[in-house]
Amino acid sequence: MTLRLGDIAPDFEQDSTEGRIRFHDWAGDNWVVLFSHPKDFTPVCTTELGAVAKLKPEFDRRNAKVIGLSVDPVEDHRRWVGDIAETQGAALYDMIHPNASDTLTVRSVFIIDPKKKVRLTLTYPAATGRNFEELLRAIDSLQLTDSHSVATPANWKQGEDVIIVPSLPDEQAREKFPQGWTALKPYLRVTKQPND
C-alpha cells in the first residue's frame, strides 16, 4: 500500500521498547515524525537516533513526537540503546518495531499531523543519513501554513519572510496582512511571517 500526501496514516498495534502501543493512541493530538531505519547496530542509524534524541526538546516545542521503526526485534532495540547513548551522548526514546516486514532497506520519513493525515514523505537511500533539522523546518512550515494563508519559499527558516498564497485576493490579503507586502509578480506577494 502506497501512502500519499493527505492519506490517513494507518493505525497499528505493536510492541515497543516502552511496551505495547497503538499508534493513533500513542500519537494523540500531536504531530508525528515516523521514520524507518534499515537495521539496529549500524553506523548511520546510530548517528540518526542520537541526533533525534539531542533534538527532542525542539520536537517537544513543536508538539511533535518522533517514533522510529525497523524490522529488528524489540530485544535488539533495547540492547542498542546503550550504544546510542555511549556514542551519541543522548538516550534513545520512542524506538519501536511496528511492522514484521523484512524488506526495509531505505530510510523513509513521514510527517503526520494531529488529524492523522500524512503531510510529508521522504525516502533516503540506506547510505545517506537524514537531516532532522530539515524535518523540524518542515514541521515549522506546515504548522505556519496551516494557520495562515501563506506558503514558505525555498530555504525558508522560522522568522523569515513568507509568500501570500495566490488564491487569496488582494482585498482579503489587506485584511490578513495589514503591514502590507511586496509584490514581485502578481502571484508572488512577499510579507513578514505572521506571529500567533
Annotate the PLM regions.
Residues 1-196:
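Chalcogenol-based redox active-site neighborhoods
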